[in-house]
């Protein structure tokens, strides 16, 4: 992928690890397993029309060369566009497209709110059988599965994939032994990876109407308590119905609890160590601070 004169990978680092885990306790738990992982980082650089560098990281349970090649190609294109971007988008409300890691982080709200650790202290009002997106969903209803990336939890609980949300309905509460017993539910262990089985619209279809697609934030944040998400725009593509313009600066501010009824997901997919699902999500009327 590093074949362009104007944009290139200027440095990279790969780490491969093998971890042996053994779990014992006074209740008779005696289990062990080994796990391999691949992670790393690289920096892409574009020299003209301005010198710009951008950092990328990656992590997989097994090396996914196809996904890594795609990420590298996208990173090279993004750093070229960032070097060409000179203005922030105008202040206003936009049809917003978020993709990749940002979409993964958004799904963290539902995973967090469905955990016994959040429900028992009263931080989350989730209950089994509730409609997590409300009763009047105009977009897609969520289908979210917790993926067991390890055979046992840190407490020695056998891990298995769990259907967390099906057609927008919370199917179960999950968590550690302590908080699960407090709530009277079966302990499952905690999960890091999710699979999202949604997607009704191709990414190309999403881009036919005017949009703002933020592909890089300076620091994207998702608050599972309040539902607010956002961050400063490092690079976004603005389509006005005729032309696509790279923009930089300004910030996005939205609330997933207010926007979740209208979510539409792409049929195009994205996968990393902790997420497997649609590449992009479409929101309507999201506030953007700009020039």
Regions found by a protein language model. Give the residues of each.
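Active-site bordering "gate/hinge" segments
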Residues: 1-143, 167, 280-291
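Dual-mode signal for accessory low-complexity, basic/Gly-rich regions
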Residues: 130-291
């Amino acid at each position: 992928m590093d074949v362009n004169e104007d944009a290139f990978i200027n440095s990279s680092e790969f780490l491969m690890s093998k971890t042996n885990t053994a779990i014992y306790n006074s209740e008779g738990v005696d289990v062990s397993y080994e796990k391999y992982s691949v992670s790393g980082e690289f920096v892409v650089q574009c020299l003209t029309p301005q010198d710009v560098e951008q950092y990328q990281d990656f992590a997989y349970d097994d090396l996914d060369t196809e996904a890594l090649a795609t990420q590298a190609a996208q990173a090279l294109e993004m750093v070229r566009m960032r070097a060409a971007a000179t203005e922030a988008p105008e202040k206003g409300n936009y049809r917003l497209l978020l993709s990749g890691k940002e979409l993964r982080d958004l799904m963290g709200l539902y995973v967090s709110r469905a955990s016994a650790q959040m429900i028992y202290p009263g931080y989350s009002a989730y209950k089994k059988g509730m409609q997590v997106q409300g009763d009047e969903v105009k977009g897609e209803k969520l289908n979210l599965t917790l993926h067991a990336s390890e055979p046992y939890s840190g407490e020695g609980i056998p891990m298995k994939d769990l259907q967390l949300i099906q057609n927008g309905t919370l199917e179960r509460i999950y968590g550690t032994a302590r908080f699960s017993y407090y709530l009277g539910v079966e302990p499952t262990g905690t999960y890091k990876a999710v699979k999202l089985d949604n997607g009704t619209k191709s990414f190309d279809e999403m881009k036919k109407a005017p949009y703002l697609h933020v592909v890089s934030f300076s620091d994207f944040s998702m608050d599972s308590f309040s539902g607010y998400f956002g961050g400063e725009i490092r690079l976004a593509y603005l389509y006005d119905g005729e032309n696509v313009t790279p923009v930089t600066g300004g910030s996005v501010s939205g609330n997933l609890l207010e926007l979740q009824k209208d979510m539409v997901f792409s049929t195009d997919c994205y996968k990393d160590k902790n997420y497997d699902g649609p590449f992009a999500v479409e929101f309507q009327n999201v506030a953007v601070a700009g020039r």
